[in-house]
Amino acid sequence: MKTLAKLHAEKGIWMTDVPHPDCGHNDVVIKISKTAICGTDMHIYQWDDWAQNTIPVPMTVGHEFVGVITEVGPEVSGFKIGDRVSGEGHITCGHCRNCRAGRRHLCRKTLGVGVNRTGAFAEYLVIPASNAFKIPNNISDDMAAIFDPFGNATHTALSFDLIGEDVLITGAGPIGAMAAAIAKHVGARNVVITDVNDFRLDLAKKMGATRTVNVSRESLKDVMTEIDMHEGFDVGLEMSGNDMAFRSMLECMNHGGKIAMLGIPGKDTLIDWNQVIFKGLIIKGIYGREMYETWYKMVAMLQSGLDISPIITHRFKVDEFQQGFDTMGSGLSGKVILDWN
């Protein structure tokens, strides 16, 4: 079968042929319809330090997908051939304390599809049936293909009560922009998002952000005055991993504010702990999606009118994958879909 794989320890992704995967007793085989390119895939493509220390070579990559089940293992129940599914890309052990307590997103032994094991950029993918998630008929393949990053946005945005709150989002990449849409959908008052990329700020505006701020030209505190904010933001969603963005967020939070962090700052990031301690801030780290509460929330929001369709800006046939990666790397895109049909 055809796959997109990391074949060499250097920049790039290559199309290759590999044997059709076998179906285990508790697995499902999924014929892939569409995939999306993730920021993680771009790290693997660029072959940066993280990728060099993490990714085995050769390996099929990719973890954002939708497809149709073509085979089910003999021990599988609840799924059948023909079911349209996406899937949770974090494979957990099922035996540790967190897994047994229903906190599978905190499993210490998590393996990532397309990171630590064979990925979804392929004609067929095998995953444990417990990681598959059925897609309702009124949700499109394009939407289902981005459930992984949509889930990151959902998990982050819904970590704290947003009703009537003023929300600051740092980082207007696809996940940040989707978080803006979610925050408005669930009842936030002001949703302000910061970045230095005008294309992505414009996209965040289309997604529902109250105010976008290019911090290379505007002061966030001036914008707070403009929109009649006097006490600071109630909730912060840190999506950028940028040290300066995080420090700015801390300065602009209200006393008693809450921050959910999905972005990964540098290991040596310096912050003013006075901002955290004397403001009584709560900071929560976010990894992946809650299994599977986040997935049900995503479906419920889409079915109740949440529109995140503007986040998909480009679509390519899988044979045009190089254009897809070039587009994603340009900074002038939202989500990029690869069609495997």
UniProtKB/Swiss-Prot annotation:
Cellular component GO terms, alphabetical: cytoplasm
GO biological process terms held by the UniProt record: L-threonine catabolic process to glycine
Active site per UniProt: 40 (charge relay system), 43 (charge relay system)
GO molecular function term, any single one: L-threonine 3-dehydrogenase activity
Cofactor: Zn(2+)
Catalytic activity as recorded in UniProt: L-threonine + NAD(+) = (2S)-2-amino-3-oxobutanoate + NADH + H(+)
Residues holding Zn(2+) 2: 93, 96, 99, 107
Keyword vocabulary terms for this entry: Cytoplasm, Metal-binding, NAD, Oxidoreductase, Zinc
Pathway, per record: Amino-acid degradation; L-threonine degradation via oxydo-reductase pathway; glycine from L-threonine: step 1/2
InterPro entries: ADH-like_C, ADH-like_N, ADH_Zn_CS, GroES-like_sf, L-Threonine_3-DHase, NAD(P)-bd_dom_sf, PKS_ER, Zn_alcohol_dh
Binding positions (Zn(2+) 1): 38, 63-64
Enzyme class: oxidoreductase
SMART domains: PKS_ER (SM00829)
Predominant place of localization: cytoplasm
UniProt binding sites for NAD(+): 175, 195, 200, 262-264, 286-287
Enzyme Commission code: 1.1.1.103
Site residues (Important for catalytic activity for the proton relay mechanism but does not participate directly in the coordination of zinc atom), renumbered to this chain: 148
Cell location: Cytoplasm
Record text on cofactor binding: Binds 2 Zn(2+) ions per subunit.
Subunit composition and interactions: Homotetramer.
Entry's family note: Belongs to the zinc-containing alcohol dehydrogenase family.
Function field: Catalyzes the NAD(+)-dependent oxidation of L-threonine to 2-amino-3-ketobutyrate.
Protein name stated in the entry: L-threonine 3-dehydrogenase
